[in-house]
Amino acid sequence: MIEIQAPVDVVPSIYPVLARRRGHIVHDAPKPGTPFYTVKAYIPIMDSFGFETDIRSYTQGQAYCIQIFDHWSVVPGDPLDDNVVLHLLEPSPPLALSKDFMIKTRRRKGLNEVCVYMYVYVYVCICMH
């Protein structure tokens, strides 16, 4: 869950940032007694890295956000599916999200991309002994 507080005049620049990061707005309303507007949204953890920097740059530093873990949700697709082809700098289709998330996580941790055949080979070798 992300809660964003911003002056009313910069709120329209928040929505495209959320959309680019697969955000889903659950509540947006003015904050009573203040000149601020509150936007609450769900955003995948994988897309939350650097979100605050983007919000601040798109609103000229006038918005701030709080990120709080809210819930787990199953990501569609199979992360080991070799039929899924991911293209650089393009959003992944819904059934390729699990593979996209896995590859991004492995790259961020300095690991190479996983190969399904490697796991099948290791599993077969272990089972045969």
What are these language model-derived features?
Residues 125-127:
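Cysteine-centered motifs
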Residues 121-123:
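Intrinsically disordered, low-complexity Ser/Thr- and Pro-rich stretches
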Residues 1-119, 129:
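Accessory interaction regions appended to the cores of large information-processing enzymes
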